[in-house]
């Protein structure tokens, strides 16, 4: 006769034992599989191995420029020259901004005084020259025009450059007045008044824009004029006090030659203006790299958003309301002393509106959070609290409060149906007479649905206005 084995554990004990075994296995899996070992990590060795791996991966050969042209669908042999009208607009705005800066204080007179300050730096007066006075100044009204932009080979090493025709026709003029001093045999022994006028009539040529190899881990754009440029200047001169010499040819040639050499030495190929591009992974002109600055800004924005969201969630969950503190705190008496009628506020869903009484007696009583008080006339007043909601959201069912005339000082709340459209809360509830067959008085919004929806509708700062064809159309 065989004996049958009967377990000693009950169902509850077996269930608990099974759950405990599952939890132990889960904890062991997380401890030894998910988490890293608790041994001390060799940080120095890890950094060295990472640096060696970065050195091996840094030997990257850049693709040839022909690959760049093929991927941008640009064929230098057949591609026509392009218009640069959009660049002209941007360049005109930049130049007009500089003109506005000079003319911002006092117009041309203020600009003249500024240029005089630049021409006469403090502590650097010349012994043989009087201070320079700017007698007239004209900043012009035209803008440089760029045209015929094309890509051309820069040298025999496969580099490319953009060639753009530039023309500037205007009348930039400035007239200077000073005096040349002869300090021998004594200071200011002789004084020769000099008046010079320089006018820029036109300048033009071919501008070259080329991206050069990195210098000190930074890429640079070189901008210059090709040697076939033209410069048209007009110079007027006036020397002497009583007997004056006007427009001396030699002096005019000397000034034009000096100004042309200045342009030649600064802006004409092989000389150039170098514009450094900002770095991405290393410090640029500012002490903070671009990606690092963007990363810090993104982290700060996320921190603020998370903290604000958590704060709002906690306040909504706990039922805290800054309006309630204002009503029950120190500002209650001052609020009751106001001669204007109180503005009904909005109560969040799931709670009941607060009934309070604005008593005009000398003895002020604190308002309880949810218990009504009666006035001398026996008519309570409603004070609805405003919920903590986002400005772009609103809840139409906040206004559906009703008063039951059969029960004194009673307030009921009616939830809206699910899926109802979201509207803005009204500014002031307007009581309406009960319809035939109903014994309740409801409060409705004084705003139309279209006005309520458009009150907090987001419109970007740069959003374009509604076109005439879109007025009155439904979305």
Curated annotation (Swiss-Prot):
GO CC annotations on file: endoplasmic reticulum; endoplasmic reticulum membrane; ERMES complex
Protein family (similarity comment): Belongs to the MMM1 family.
Designated name of the protein: Maintenance of mitochondrial morphology protein 1
Membrane topology according to the record: Single-pass type I membrane protein
Chain segments annotated as transmembrane: 15-35
CDD domains to which the protein is assigned, alphabetical: SMP_Mmm1
Subunit structure and binding partners: Homodimer. Component of the ER-mitochondria encounter structure (ERMES) or MDM complex, composed of MMM1, MDM10, MDM12 and MDM34. A MMM1 homodimer associates with one molecule of MDM12 on each side in a pairwise head-to-tail manner, and the SMP-LTD domains of MMM1 and MDM12 generate a continuous hydrophobic tunnel for phospholipid trafficking.
One BP annotation, GO: mitochondrial genome maintenance
Region (Disordered) location: 321-381, 394-475
Organism name: Cryptococcus neoformans var. neoformans serotype D (strain JEC21 / ATCC MYA-565)
Extent of Pro residues compositional bias: 341-351
Primary location group: endoplasmic reticulum
Residue ranges annotated as Lumenal topological domain: 1-14
Lineage, broadest ranks: Eukaryota, Fungi, Dikarya, Basidiomycota, Agaricomycotina
Gene Ontology molecular function: any one: lipid binding
Cellular compartments annotated: Endoplasmic reticulum membrane
Sequence ranges assigned to domain SMP-LTD in this UniProt record: 80-278
Residues in the Cytoplasmic compartment per record: 36-475
Reported function: Component of the ERMES/MDM complex, which serves as a molecular tether to connect the endoplasmic reticulum (ER) and mitochondria. Components of this complex are involved in the control of mitochondrial shape and protein biogenesis, and function in nonvesicular lipid trafficking between the ER and mitochondria. The MDM12-MMM1 subcomplex functions in the major beta-barrel assembly pathway that is responsible for biogenesis of all outer membrane beta-barrel proteins, and acts in a late step after the SAM complex.
UniProt keyword terms in alphabetical order: Endoplasmic reticulum, Lipid transport, Lipid-binding, Membrane, Transmembrane, Transmembrane helix, Transport
Swiss-Prot/TrEMBL domain comment: The SMP-LTD domain is a barrel-like domain that can bind various types of glycerophospholipids in its interior and mediate their transfer between two adjacent bilayers.
Domain of life from the UniProt record: Eukaryota
């Amino acid at each position: 006769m065989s004996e049958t084995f009967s377990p000693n554990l009950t169902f509850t004990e077996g269930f608990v034992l099974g759950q405990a075994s599952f939890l132990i296995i889960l904890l062991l899996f997380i401890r030894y599989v998910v988490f890293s070992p608790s041994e001390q990590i060799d940080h120095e060795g890890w950094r060295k191995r990472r640096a060696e791996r970065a050195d091996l991966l840094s030997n990257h050969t850049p693709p040839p420029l022909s690959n760049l042209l093929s991927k941008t669908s640009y064929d230098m042999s057949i591609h026509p020259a392009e218009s640069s009208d959009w660049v002209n607009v941007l360049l005109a705005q930049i130049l007009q901004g500089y003109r506005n800066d000079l003319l911002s204080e006092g117009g041309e007179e203020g600009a003249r005084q500024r240029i005089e300050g630049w021409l006469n730096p403090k502590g650097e007066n010349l012994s043989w020259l009087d201070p320079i006075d700017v007698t007239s100044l004209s900043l012009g009204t035209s803008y440089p025009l760029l045209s015929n932009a094309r890509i051309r080979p820069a040298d025999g090493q496969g580099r490319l450059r953009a060639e753009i025709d530039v023309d500037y026709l205007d009348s930039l003029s400035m007239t200077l007045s000073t005096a040349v001093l002869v300090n021998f045999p004594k200071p200011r022994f002789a004084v020769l008044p000099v008046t010079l006028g320089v006018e820029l009539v036109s300048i033009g040529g071919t501008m070259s824009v080329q991206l050069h190899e990195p210098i000190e881990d930074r890429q640079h754009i070189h901008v210059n004029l090709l040697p076939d440029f033209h410069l048209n200047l007009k110079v007027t001169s006036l020397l002497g006090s009583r007997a004056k010499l006007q427009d001396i040819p030699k002096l005019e040639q000397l000034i034009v030659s000096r100004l042309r050499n200045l342009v030649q030495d600064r802006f004409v190929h092989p000389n150039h203006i170098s514009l450094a591009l900002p770095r991405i992974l290393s410090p640029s002109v500012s002490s903070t790299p671009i990606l690092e600055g963007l990363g810090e800004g993104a982290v700060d924005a996320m921190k603020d958003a998370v903290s604000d969201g958590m704060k709002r969630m906690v306040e909504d969950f706990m039922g805290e309301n800054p309006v309630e503190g204002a009503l029950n705190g120190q500002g209650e008496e001052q609020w009751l002393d106001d001669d204007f009628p109180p503005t009904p506020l909005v109560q969040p869903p799931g709670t009941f509106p607060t009934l309070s009484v604005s008593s005009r007696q000398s003895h002020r009583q604190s308002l309880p959070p949810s218990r009504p008080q009666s006035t001398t006339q026996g008519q309570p007043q409603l004070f609805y609290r405003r919920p903590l909601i986002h400005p772009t959201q609103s809840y139409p069912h906040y206004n559906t409060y009703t008063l039951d005339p059969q029960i004194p000082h009673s307030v009921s709340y009616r939830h809206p149906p699910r899926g109802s459209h979201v509207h803005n809360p009204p500014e002031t509830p307007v009581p309406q007479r009960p319809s035939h067959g109903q014994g309740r008085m409801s409060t409705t919004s004084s705003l139309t649905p279209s006005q309520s929806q458009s009150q907090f509708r987001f419109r970007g700062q740069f959003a374009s206005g509604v076109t005439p064809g879109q007025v009155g159309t439904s979305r």
